[in-house]
UniProtKB/Swiss-Prot annotation:
Listed GO biological process terms: chromosome condensation; sperm DNA condensation
Protein name, per record: Sperm histone
One cellular component term from this protein's GO annotations in UniProt: nucleus
Lineage: superkingdom: Eukaryota
Family listed: Belongs to the protamine P1 family.
Protein keywords: Chromosome, Developmental protein, Differentiation, DNA condensation, DNA-binding, Nucleosome core, Nucleus, Phosphoprotein, Spermatogenesis
Phosphothreonine carried by residues: 9
Chain's role: Protamines substitute for histones in the chromatin of sperm during the haploid phase of spermatogenesis. They compact sperm DNA into a highly condensed, stable and inactive complex.
Naturally occurring in which organism (per UniProt): Coturnix japonica (Japanese quail)
Tissue distribution of the protein: Testis.
Subcellular location: Nucleus; Chromosome
Amino acid sequence: MARYRRTRTRSRSRRRRRSRRRRSSRRRRYGRSRRSYRSVGRRRRRYGRRRRRRRRY
């Protein structure tokens, strides 16, 4: 997080423009499927971690 903050304050306008352009292209390519896949992966990972810890202990 600290690293991201530093770069953001350093070159704000330049980075903002670049990220915006990249984001739009990415959205067109993946679309809605990527968002759902990401959320599902996150949920599954969290659940798996919790289960593992419980079993170990």
